[in-house]
Amino acid sequence: MLTVAQNTDTAFNGSLTGPLTLIKSGTGTLALGCTANTFGGDYVVSNGILAVTASGALGTDSGLDLAGGKLHLGVSDSIRRLFYDGVQQPRGTYGSTASDAQHKDDTRFTGTQVLAVIESPPVAFTSRVWDAGAGTDTALATAANWVDDVLPPFDGTALAIFGSDGTAATVTTATSLYGVSFDRDANFNVDGTAALTLGQGGLSAVDRTSGRAYTVTTPLTLEDSQTWDIGANVTVQLSGTISDTPGVPPTLIKTGKGRVQLNAENTFAGPLTISNGTLRITNGGALGTTAGATTVRGDLGGKLLLSGTFTSDEPLILGGDLNNFGLLQLENGNVTLAGPVTMVAQTRVQTGGGKTLTFTGGITGNGNGLLVVNPGGGTIAFADKPIRIPGQTLYFDQTGFCVIAVTNNLWGDTLVSGGTLRCDLPDVLPPTTLMRIGVHYSPSGTLDLNGNDQTVSRLTLGTFDPGQRAIQSATPATLTVHQNASDVLDVRFEGAVSLLKSGTGTLTLTNAFSTTSGGFSVTNGTLAVSGEGTFGPNCTNVTVLGTGTLALGHSMAIANKAAVVRMPSAGVSSAKINLAAGVDVQVGWLFYGDEKKPAGTYGASGSNAQNKDTTHFTGTGKLTVLGDCSGTLVILR
């Protein structure tokens, strides 16, 4: 507890955090101006004025008791609970008569802005049990359908328990309940076209040992913030539209291990949190308006399921990955998520074969956790707005496609394993990313440039276990690697992809099965070919420029005898080809700058080459040039 007994006016722009109780006394004004407060305690204003000068300064999880003092609203803000002299007030907006608030009070508020209060005081309720005593008459308003033939009060103070008998209840007139509880150990429907208003009791269903389905087709109105607590092995389908009452939108929380399915285009505006179990949506408007975001607490076992073909504009807040369960999954169809996505912890998104999940609203992160992409044989795509998760890893480790079709992305490392990462525009990969292909439990992986040049800071393997690892492009495209570390790369180059190695490190190629028609270039550091590695039979362009070194460890490193090798002009000693002992690499032509060199053998002074040139060659092996200056190529056998 902190008591601020001040008779002067001061401003505090620092951060308030935790469950502190702050008591403002004295005749002065204390102004709060920090927008990043995470305060979850209570303010008590017993005298003077507590002023808000920045939205968010009070903290959305805080409580406020105006117990003799006033709140000045220079900007609008929101809190969880409001008290007048210790008595909690209902959810709504508050302010002076100069404001647009629902509840106006000049004795407690000054300024022209409003205070939004999210939570109402607890409501006293009674429970009534449905026994279906009226037989075929299933009307909710028939007394014989309730235990002791006594109707519940339909004024929002009754918890309706559908528990002892029957399979259906019908809402024939507009009805208000504290909440609905499904205790019936059989499937049950609540039907009708009249609105059913739910208060703080929300919806609940107990755990079952076998599957049970409860269906509500009548429209629902959310009167207050509430929890839908659905037990294990239970599915509650809501097919009527869901709206809320005017004022501050109520908050909605899905808990329990069971499932809620939303089938209608809904208009509720409050925030929705999936904290446990699953919530399935079957259309783009199921999550209500975009005024309130949907939060998925994967860390607690919450998961959002998408079923159908639609576009959703809902803002999403995603975080947590309990036991690699995932928190967002496309079950069937093709869905586009066009709203902004905020990552607050590791996030795993999933789909399956024949399905496409597309993110077009952009993704932002706080530096905490992986973005795990699990297509499961399908496609997960990112387009229109970028992924901006600095320091976090894009972790793609299943079969199928991860498609990047937007530029200006920012993340840390990139893992490609199991499937294909496809680049649908130039420069979609962050140039600072480390590209890792394969991982021990999924050693294969493909990077597909798809005709678009890309740049990465490092190219490496996540495992040396056998696997099908490839970098490809059906049409010409270049992967530039600014490699300052040294890595051995067992990766095939296929299609028409080219590799440009820069950076001070050494990149060693060991794969014997490359088939690309693209070229290989080195401008800094070392590009090495060793073991059974080769540029492949279709590569005809090899370039060694700048301060780069091409290290060739065996005679078939450049397999195409019609290949053209380009190096700096004569006398320029910055770039070199290193030829290991016993190596005789045969190529078509050799250029020093624009000068075509004559046929013959070339090497360093320690080689047995005809043309010894220490400015361009090192090692004791030799390079045999088969083509003469006239363009004739002579193949030696």
Q: Residue locations for each model-derived region?
A:
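Short Cys/His-rich zinc-binding micro-motifs
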Residues: 34
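Beta-strand repeat architectures
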Residues: 1-31, 40-96, 109-126, 142-237, ...
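Long, compositionally biased intrinsically disordered regions
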Residues: 603-604, 609
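Short, solvent-exposed loop/turn elements at domain surfaces
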Residues: 136-141
